[in-house]
């Protein structure tokens, strides 16, 4: 079962790995949108991601199993992405990207919930499974970002990233329907919507976790969507940007593989403090801006920043969830 969950994670992160590192360049250099429009478009997944988990937290493992819901979300997201790849005007692109965010963003919480449901020991096993998601990101960064983009002229191959993402979503949709269902006991359908999942966060420690995650997530978005134009401004060619950013994902693979042992030794809370501290250090390095070795070293700290804070946070939430509230709690935490 660990292999099947690892493959699910590989495909899940292959999907955004094809688009996120180059999306801002695609909007700016290929579609020639001004900077303020690029910013508005990139904000859409965050807005959609804020709304979608409330709905998903109610139906996941209640009206439909998490595995089936994951497949449905990816199938619809793939269709939306194909349409999106054909858009050249700002308003249609903005609207469709918001729809895509509504469909795709909840899949992060769903894959976490599915993996956490099936593993016997979340603290020991989850990091090793989640590691393969990052491996998927690294593979597409090199296969598409370096080998494919390098063979094109200028930015003419950037639109292909959207089609790669859509195709992988279709593959994952089909694969999701073959996964064993997460069986939970029946719940009272008359229960107030979201109440059981929201009650998970009523504890003071989890409230503090959500506040810290909110702040850290705001900073983290600059890495995902701002690094490609930042590296481009520093003189990196388009075909080298995704491989350069994949250094962070390679370090993430290593840290995730060691996460279980690290959490057993230092605990979740200390790990999250280290992750937040590393986040601050790397942005200081980015602000300095040179030499190249410092920038690449700062990118390499991504593994500690992400795994020690965000992945540890998912495990912490799972510790305080029941099988009935697991999927909903993961969705709400994704906000």
Feature map (PLM): residue ranges:
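Helix-to-loop junctions at the C-terminal end of transmembrane segments
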Residues: 51-65, 148-152, 254-268
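C-terminal membrane-cytosol helix-exit motif in multi-pass small-molecule transporters
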Residues: 144-148, 161, 166-185
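Intracellular juxtamembrane helix-capping segments at the cytosolic ends
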Residues: 23, 105-120, 308-322
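Structural signature of the two symmetry-related core transmembrane helices
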Residues: 68-82, 270-285
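Helix-loop boundary and gating motifs at the non-cytosolic
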Residues: 1-46, 205-246
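Hydrophobic core of transmembrane alpha-helices in multi-pass small-molecule transporters
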Residues: 10, 80-84, 90-110, 114, ...
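Conserved MFS/SLC helix-loop-helix module at the cytosolic interface between two early adjacent transmembrane helices
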Residues: 51-88
């Amino acid at each position: 079962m660990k292999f099947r969950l690892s493959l699910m994670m590989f495909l899940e992160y292959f999907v955004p790995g094809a688009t996120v590192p180059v999306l801002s360049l695609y909007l700016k250099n290929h579609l020639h949108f001004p900077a303020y429009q690029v910013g508005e478009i990139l904000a859409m997944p965050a807005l959609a991601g804020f709304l979608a988990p409330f709905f998903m937290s109610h139906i996941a493992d209640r009206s439909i199993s998490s595995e089936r819901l994951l497949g449905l979300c990816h199938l619809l997201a793939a269709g939306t992405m194909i349409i999106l790849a054909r858009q050249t005007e700002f308003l249609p692109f903005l609207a469709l990207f918001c729809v895509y965010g509504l469909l795709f963003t909840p899949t992060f919480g769903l894959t976490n919930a599915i993996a956490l449901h099936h593993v016997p020991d979340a603290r020991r096993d989850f990091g090793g499974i989640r590691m393969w998601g990052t491996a998927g990101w690294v593979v597409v960064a090199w296969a598409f970002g370096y080998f494919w983009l390098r063979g094109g002229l200028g930015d003419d191959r950037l639109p292909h990233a959207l089609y790669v993402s859509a195709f992988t979503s279709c593959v994952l949709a089909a694969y999701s329907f073959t996964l064993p269902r997460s069986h939970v006991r029946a719940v009272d359908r008359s229960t107030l919507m979201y109440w059981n999942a929201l009650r998970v966060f009523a504890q003071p420690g989890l409230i503090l976790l959500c506040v810290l995650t909110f702040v850290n997530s705001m900073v983290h978005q600059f890495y995902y969507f701002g690094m490609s134009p930042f590296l481009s401004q520093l003189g990196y060619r388009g075909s080298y940007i995704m491989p350069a950013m994949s250094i962070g994902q390679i370090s993430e693979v290593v840290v995730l593989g060691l996460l279980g042992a690290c959490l057993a030794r230092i605990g979740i809370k200390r790990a999250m403090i280290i992750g937040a501290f590393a986040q601050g250090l790397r942005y200081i390095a980015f602000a300095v801006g040179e030499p190249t070795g410092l920038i690449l070293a700062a990118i390499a700290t991504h593994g500690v920043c992400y795994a020690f804070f965000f992945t540890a946070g998912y495990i912490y939430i799972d510790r305080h969830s029941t099988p009935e509230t697991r999927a909903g709690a993961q969705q709400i935490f994704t906000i």
